[in-house]
Design a protein with these regions (language model features):
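Conserved mid-sequence domains
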Residues: 229, 233-244, 252, 264-267, ...
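Residue-level hotspots within the lipid-embedded alpha helices of multi-pass solute transporters
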Residues: 16-20, 55, 91, 95, ...
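Transmembrane helix-loop-helix hairpins in multi-pass inner-membrane proteins
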Residues: 1-2, 53-163, 251-307
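Alpha-helical transmembrane segments of multipass membrane proteins
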Residues: 103-107, 187, 217-218, 240, ...
Length: 307
């Protein structure tokens, strides 16, 4: 790492900022489609806070979305369920381009190198996701009203229990819970029905993934490792799957997968580890630190009183 080119290192962090901005603009597009008047730069800051929540809670987005929804509702002036629908929509749309990019990389390498066991596993994972994600999306959408009813049945006793345990909070009624769950699904329907907004959000999501791949590629280049760009297109999306591990932000799991795949693709062990450290410092540590400060402001009583 000490031998890394400082100019290229600066470019890594600049690209990381571009990634965060692109996905923040994706959030802005979704919120605008839901009737929020939030400004683009504010949405980027809010997304940084949401990224902090994802990075410090287990299971990545699944653990951070409820907290991120609170930040969104406070800053965008929306109901909590609308904020939850917005961040859930953004995270779902963000996931789609990763499958396509990883598929492009896998196809490229199938014509260039023979697959070892690790590359075969990566290709199987990408293929499984390419099939499973569209199928689950179609099934979930076709049966969304049943899913909504099931969500109400599950949420009602849980919310009632929390309401009894938390001091100075009365348990919500079943009608209030049903209204909020319906509001969440109604917001999801509004997002899915806005084709122009979906296309724009998808474009920002794709740009963000390209920035992430570029960050890893530049991290390798800073260490004197010149690799084909499709290497990053394969490694970054597959590594993101490790973000679902029960560790904050997938910490440890993501790094292990990234290093393993880079080594399988011919990068020396030491260079792979150093490049991943640089890449994750720019795309994990930096947004966690910056997003944590923003989250502190959004969560403060002063902000709540002024909003």
């Amino acid at each position: 790492i000490r031998r890394a080119d400082p100019t290229v290192l600066a470019a890594v962090f600049a690209v990381a900022v571009c990634w965060l901005s692109a996905w923040g603009l994706a959030l802005w597009t979704v919120l605008s489609g839901l009737g929020s008047s939030i400004r683009a730069h504010v949405a980027i800051l809010v997304f940084a806070a949401a990224t902090f929540a994802n990075n410090v809670t287990p299971f990545g987005q699944a653990g951070g979305e409820p907290v991120a929804a609170l930040f969104i509702s406070r800053s965008a002036g929306t109901e909590y369920e609308t904020g939850l629908a917005a961040i859930a929509s953004v995270d779902s749309i963000n996931f789609v381009p990763s499958i396509g990019l990883a598929s492009v990389g896998i196809v490229y390498f199938s014509t260039q190198v023979s697959f070892g066991s690790r590359l075969q596993f990566a290709s199987y994972a990408v293929a499984a996701l390419a099939i499973a994600v569209p199928v689950l999306a179609v099934v979930g959408w076709n049966y969304r009203y049943r899913v909504e009813a099931a969500a109400v049945r599950v949420a009602t006793p849980v919310a009632s229990l929390v309401g009894r345990v938390v001091p100075r909070r009365s348990p919500p009624t079943a009608d209030a819970i049903r209204s909020r769950v319906e509001g969440f699904f109604h917001a999801i329907e509004r997002v899915s029905g806005n084709r122009r907004g979906l296309a724009l959000t998808f474009g920002f999501a794709l740009l963000g993934w390209l920035c992430l791949a570029t960050s890893l590629w530049l991290s390798l280049f800073a260490l004197g490792q010149t690799v084909a760009y499709p290497v990053a297109l394969v490694v970054v999306p597959v590594g993101a799957i490790a973000g679902a591990t029960p560790l904050p932000g997938g910490l440890g799991g993501v790094e292990a997968v990234l290093i393993t795949l880079l080594v399988a693709l011919g990068v020396p062990n030491g260079a792979a580890a150093a490049a991943v450290i640089i890449h994750r410092t720019a795309t994990y540590v930096l947004p966690t630190v910056v997003g944590g400060g923003i989250a502190g402001v959004l969560g403060s009583d002063t902000f709540a009183a002024g909003s």
